[in-house]
């Protein structure tokens, strides 16, 4: 009674197929598979970009630094 047998799961599957229909279930499966694939691709891209970012940020920091002499401003009354 604690676990379901294969027959219980088959009955549940048949009921779900009757309620949603096979086309709707297929679309849900495709959407879920596409989301998982997109997530995995995003994780791979994120790891590759994270490794390249420190070197690129140092170059940007060096190229945008402006080196000038500071002038003392006096107050006139």
From Swiss-Prot:
Which source organism does the UniProt entry give?
A: Cupriavidus necator (strain ATCC 17699 / DSM 428 / KCTC 22496 / NCIMB 10442 / H16 / Stanier 337)
Transmembrane region(s): 1-21
In the record, the note on similarity to other proteins reads:
Belongs to the TatA/E family.
Q: What protein name is recorded for this chain?
A: Sec-independent protein translocase protein TatA
Protein's UniProt keywords contain Metal-binding:
no
Organism domain of life: Bacteria
**Record keywords, A-Z:** Cell inner membrane, Cell membrane, Membrane, Protein transport, Translocation, Transmembrane, Transmembrane helix, Transport
Q: Where is this region: Disordered?
A: 46-77
* GO-annotated molecular function: protein transmembrane transporter activity
**Disulfide bond positions:** none
Q: How does it assemble?
A: The Tat system comprises two distinct complexes: a TatABC complex, containing multiple copies of TatA, TatB and TatC subunits, and a separate TatA complex, containing only TatA subunits. Substrates initially bind to the TatABC complex, which probably triggers association of the separate TatA complex to form the active translocon.
Please provide the Gene Ontology terms (biological process) for this protein: protein transport by the Tat complex
Topology versus the membrane, per the UniProt entry? Single-pass membrane protein
Q: Which GO terms describe its cellular component?
A: TAT protein transport complex
What this chain does, per the entry, is described as: Part of the twin-arginine translocation (Tat) system that transports large folded proteins containing a characteristic twin-arginine motif in their signal peptide across membranes. TatA could form the protein-conducting channel of the Tat system.
* Cytoplasm keyword on record: no
Subcellular localization is given as: Cell inner membrane
Q: What is its main location?
A: membrane
InterPro entries from the UniProt entry: TatA/B/E, TatA/E
């Amino acid at each position: 009674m604690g676990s379901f047998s294969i027959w219980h799961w088959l009955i549940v599957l048949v009921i779900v197929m009757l309620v949603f229909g096979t086309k709707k279930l297929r679309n849900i499966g495709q959407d879920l598979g596409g989301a998982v694939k997109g997530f995995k691709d995003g994780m791979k891209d994120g790891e590759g970009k994270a490794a390249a970012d420190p070197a690129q940020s140092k170059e940007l920091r060096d190229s945008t630094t402006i080196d000038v002499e500071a002038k003392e401003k006096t107050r006139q009354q």
